[in-house]
């Protein structure tokens, strides 16, 4: 590998909307995410919808679908 062409890695802090904080290495020092392994339905076993713009409600109304 060539020297001097790769970006410098820094300690990065990743914050989820649920409040979970992760630390890793990245070229950015701070990132936010809406969903992570602590709050994602696949990992938690719970069924819930994460909706930030009302898309799920519009879809449910359009197809007469009930949200649980």
Curated annotation (Swiss-Prot):
Any Pfam family hit: Ribosomal_L31
Gene3D superfamilies in alphabetical order: Ribosomal protein L31
InterPro entries (alphabetical): Ribosomal_bL28/bL31-like_sf, Ribosomal_bL31, Ribosomal_bL31_A, Ribosomal_bL31_sf
Signal peptide segment: none
List of residues binding Zn(2+): 16, 18, 36, 39
Record's cofactor remark: Binds 1 zinc ion per subunit.
GO BP terms, alphabetized: translation
Disulfide bond sites: none
One of the record's GO molecular function terms: structural constituent of ribosome
GO cellular component: ribonucleoprotein complex; ribosome
Cofactor dependency: Zn(2+)
Alphabetized NCBIfam families for the sequence: L31 (TIGR00105), PRK00019.1 (NF000612), PRK00528.1 (NF001809)
Quaternary structure note: Part of the 50S ribosomal subunit.
Family statement: Belongs to the bacterial ribosomal protein bL31 family. Type A subfamily.
Designated name of the protein: Large ribosomal subunit protein bL31
Gene: rpmE
């Amino acid at each position: 590998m060539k020297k001097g062409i790769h970006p410098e890695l820094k300690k990065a802090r990743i914050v989820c909307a649920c409040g979970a904080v992760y630390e890793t290495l990245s070229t950015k020092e701070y990132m936010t995410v809406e969903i992570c392994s602590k709050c994602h339905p696949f990992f938690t076993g719970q069924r819930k919808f994460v909706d930030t713009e009302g898309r799920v409600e519009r879809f449910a109304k359009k197809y007469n679908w009930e949200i649980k």
